[in-house]
Design a protein with these regions (language model features):
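Membrane-helix interface linkers and caps
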Residues: 20-30
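Metalloprotease/metallohydrolase-associated module, dominated by Zn2+-dependent proteases
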Residues: 2, 7-21, 34-38, 55, ...
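Active-site scaffold of zinc-dependent metalloenzymes
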Residues: 90-133, 140-143
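Active-site recognition of the HExxH zinc-binding catalytic motif
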Residues: 130-158
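Cys/His-rich zinc-coordinating "finger/knuckle" motifs
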Residues: 87, 119, 211
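Short extracytoplasmic
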Residues: 68-101
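Internal/C-terminal transmembrane anchor helices
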Residues: 29-57
Length: 222
């Protein structure tokens, strides 16, 4: 909101400059000519301050549409929390959270930025960027209705390939990214233990109890 307020202030400065060239200001007999450098500066600043918020709004809408598809058309509304939002969030220690009743998904700072970074170079994705993809898929599964964390995570693991493709990642790269997360990030949860073990199940494997046998599953043969 502060970014938008700053942008509106510079828009007002631009408006005042243009209006001053059309209508004489109090105490002057004629309008003043427009100061082109000043007008250009305030317009650039208006756009620069508006961009972070506008980009976040666009990205949230983009993610909401894809999350809805992942959640079998249960309506999802993704909100990318700013640092301030995250600090005030009762679930600030979680990377994300979702309410299946409202469809609202909150992704904590900085994970939306990490996901955006992943989408800019998926063929060079690091472990953290692959985790951001899984967070998005995981919360979409909550909107779908599953609340058990280990089952939800297994549903996400099987759909990360689908999620990556919905987000615009090329097929071959999406498959590799999804498998990399399953073989590395997901298996690491078992090794770390503690709270991470709540997101892991030995039955989350091809042919085991949690295998949904999806035609486009992460681990399905091409």
């Amino acid at each position: 909101m502060l970014w938008i307020l700053a942008s509106l202030f510079f828009c007002w400065c631009a408006y005042r400059e243009i209006r001053g060239s059309l209508v004489a200001r109090p105490g002057f007999d004629s309008p003043a000519p427009v100061s082109t450098p000043y007008l250009a500066l305030v317009l650039v600043l208006a756009v620069a301050f508006a961009w972070p918020t506008v980009h976040r709004w666009y990205f949230q809408r983009f993610l909401s549409i894809r999350a809805t598809l992942l959640a079998d058309n249960h309506r999802a509304i993704v909100h990318c929390n700013t640092l301030f939002d995250t600090m005030l969030d009762p679930e600030m220690l979680a990377a994300g959270h979702a309410n299946p009743l409202t469809g609202k998904i909150g992704i904590q700072s900085p994970w939306c930025n990490v996901l955006s970074s992943y989408l800019s170079h998926p063929n060079r994705a690091d472990d953290r960027e692959l985790q951001s993809l899984d967070i998005f898929t995981h919360e979409s599964m909550h909107v779908r209705g599953e609340m058990n964390e280990s089952i939800t995570e297994c549903e996400a693991v099987q759909r990360n390939y689908r999620a990556a493709k919905l987000l615009g990642v090329a097929d071959e790269t999406a498959k590799k990214n999804a498998l990399d997360y399953y073989n590395n990030g997901y298996q690491l949860r078992r090794k770390i233990g503690g709270i991470q073990s709540a997101y892991y199940s030995e039955q989350c494997s091809p042919g085991k109890a949690l295998d949904e046998h999806l035609s486009d599953s992460t681990w399905a043969a091409p």
